Amino acid sequence: MHKPTPRTESPNALAFITRFFAAESAGGLVLMAAALAALIVANSPLGDSYFAALHAVFAGLSVSHWINDGLMAIFFMLVGLEIKREVLAGQLASWSQRALPGFAALGGMLVPALIYVAFNWGRPDTIGGWAIPAATDIAFALGVLSLLGKRVPLSLKIFLSALAILDDLGAVLIIALFYTSDLSIPMLLAALGSIAMLVALNRLGVKKLLPYLIVGALLWFFMLQSGIHATLAGVALALCIPLGKPDEEARSPLLHLEEKLHPWVAFAVVPIFGFANAGVSLSGITADTLVDPVPLGVALGLLVGKQVGIFAMAALAIRAGLARLPDGSNWGQLYGVAALCGIGFTMSLFIGALAFPGAPELVDEVKVGVLIGSVLSAVLGVVVLRRFAQRG
């Protein structure tokens, strides 16, 4: 996830952004290691113990549910903090800044979804996974981008970060609108009451974080019981935490919380999620499995849909005069970044688990598709960026 960026230019701005991307890429590398470890363990003699541990029940929920509904609420809270900061005072603060990543994010969500739907049309048991290839994993993408060092201009990394913020926003809306189960009206009303309390705290000018966190914990519980996915409590909480005025940046509750959360999310929450969700037994995977509609739709949605959707919409915006290429970059480098956006690991796996509850065989197929599509996208992106870095 993304650490806070300065809201005003300063002599140290470049150094700050450089440190930010170094930390981001480091988190991506840790996530890669966790995913690889999960695959190794799941296909070793420890595989049965690995899956048994994930299904062990603690306080009424399995370990897997605690990770996906509990820990990931912290991940989504950081997503919400980033969205609010960037829209109010960051890379998305003006319409001109939003244009290129906005068009790119739209194309990068629509085309992969259409590709998945094309492969799963007429299959009511699998069509609900249409949103799986629509997300980009920013930590993974920046981790891969870091392997290229100075071959990639900083402006492209900022573009990728802004695109990912809008991509995350789209994923949050998709989860809220399309992956909500049967609702409990009393619990939903209690959740709405909690949100009203958070808004009241904000309007009253409360700057202490503790009251927000206490009400946020209640909101998480009510959402868990209501049928709305509990992770959205993290987003709602984040959007109510005050950013403060530019001259109060040192005392900004939002920036303070974001700074504290970032290392925990990057180096604990997301790697734990990756380790718990990337493990899939390959013993039953055959050539026929790879061409099943779900893994094929997911893999091609990420590999083909992401790069085509992002590059085509970005090019359209640039040619129409609505946006311009990131400073110091060329068309080939923009295409390379679009290919890297096919790395859809964390959010794709998360949406896959929501799309097919109670269907572990389909979730395993999603994992195969996500892994294949993400790895091939990473390889293609690196090859393209290395090729065009020599010319640009």
UniProtKB/Swiss-Prot annotation:
The lineage of its organism: Bacteria, Pseudomonadati, Pseudomonadota, Gammaproteobacteria, Pseudomonadales. The keyword Oxidoreductase does not apply. Keywords: Antiport, Cell inner membrane, Cell membrane, Ion transport, Membrane, Sodium, Sodium transport, Transmembrane, Transmembrane helix, Transport. NCBIfam families: NhaA, PRK09560.1, PRK09561.1. PANTHER family: NA(+)_H(+) ANTIPORTER NHAA (PTHR30341:SF0), SODIUM ION/PROTON ANTIPORTER NHAA-RELATED (PTHR30341). Belongs to the NhaA Na(+)/H(+) (TC 2.A.33) antiporter family. It is found in: Cell inner membrane. This is Na(+)/H(+) antiporter NhaA 2. Gene3D superfamilies: Na+/H+ antiporter like domain (1.20.1530.10).
